[in-house]
Regions:
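Helix-turn-helix DNA-binding segment
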Residues: 281
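Structured, helix-rich domain cores that form ligand/interaction pockets
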Residues: 1-278
């Protein structure tokens, strides 16, 4: 099941009722209102726009809307609760059922959190095994390791970000989010020694290509039965012999198991010690 840390949905303006106009930025063209925009950056990103000119409702939010259930990320099971949580804020009332049926997904961050003890070591190994540095550009953006497909055409662009999720949560910008949780420590413990792989798909065509779908309905996107993160890694990493971390890996977990073995010099006792050291109590 696909899991997302961000989703953007476009639907009909008929599916929103603005309750508190004072919480929206009202945009005019001459004397006519053309849109209402609600933007929230903390404790989680939320953007709601009622575009009168285009008769569209635009909703964008991140997985932190799930609060204590954030580890589950946005998925097919909890997407309705995510939208209902927007209604609980009190600035607008969304017709959740119609949005889920008739909305179109136009942007997503496909996400996978994987247990691994050393994010820095893992990203070094991934970078060392990139097959073509002209085609795939590794770089550091906002303190995170990224690999981007170096193409001009937007529909073919793809960016994968790899970072230590526990460290990211402890940054100052997440202080308000953590303060509103029922059990902050439980969430931090969950993300201890977790490496996050996050693929940014910022256009309809990118989503179609990465998820192997033609229909961009909410259900179609969240029901996609593929792992685009692994497929991207499979494209960018070199073919290697049996001792290389990328050799004959069937899925992302196998890749990380191989990386752990390589870090521990293929010594099973060292592997077991690392797992005990970084396992949650």
């Amino acid at each position: 099941m696909i899991r997302l840390d961000k989703i953007k949905i476009v639907s009909s303006i008929d599916y929103i009722k603005i309750i508190d106009k004072n919480r929206f930025d009202i945009h005019y063209k001459e004397n006519d209102v053309v849109s209402y925009k609600f933007t929230q950056l903390q404790p989680f990103l939320l953007y709601v726009e009622a575009n009168i000119k285009n008769q569209e409702l635009i909703i964008e939010f991140t997985g932190k809307i799930l609060r204590d259930n954030y580890p589950s990320l946005i998925n097919r099971i909890n997407i309705k609760n995510c939208l209902l949580s927007i209604n609980e804020i009190g600035s607008c009332l969304l017709d959740v059922d119609n949005i889920l049926i008739r909305g179109e997904v136009v942007k997503v961050d496909v996400t996978q959190d994987v247990p691994y003890p050393d994010c820095g070591e893992l990203t070094k190994m991934i970078q060392a095994n990139i097959s073509n540095f002209r085609k795939y550009l590794p770089r550091i953006i906002n303190r995170n390791f990224t690999i981007e497909k170096n193409v001009v055409t937007k529909s073919y662009k793809c960016r994968l970000t790899v970072y230590d999720k526990n460290k990211e949560l402890k940054r100052v910008e997440n202080k308000l989010f953590l303060s509103q949780l029922l059990d902050k420590q439980k969430l931090l413990n969950y993300f201890e020694s977790k490496v996050r792989f996050e693929m940014n798909l910022n256009s309809k065509e990118q989503i179609r290509k990465a998820l192997h779908i033609t229909d961009l309905s909410v259900d179609s996107v969240l029901s996609a039965n593929v792992n685009p993160i692994w497929e991207f890694l499979d494209q960018i990493l070199v073919d290697a012999d049996s001792t290389d971390i990328t050799a004959k890996c069937d899925d992302l977990k196998e890749l990380l198991r191989g990386a752990l073995l390589q870090v521990c010099d293929y010594d099973i006792k060292k592997v077991e010690a690392q797992l005990r050291l970084h396992s949650s109590p």
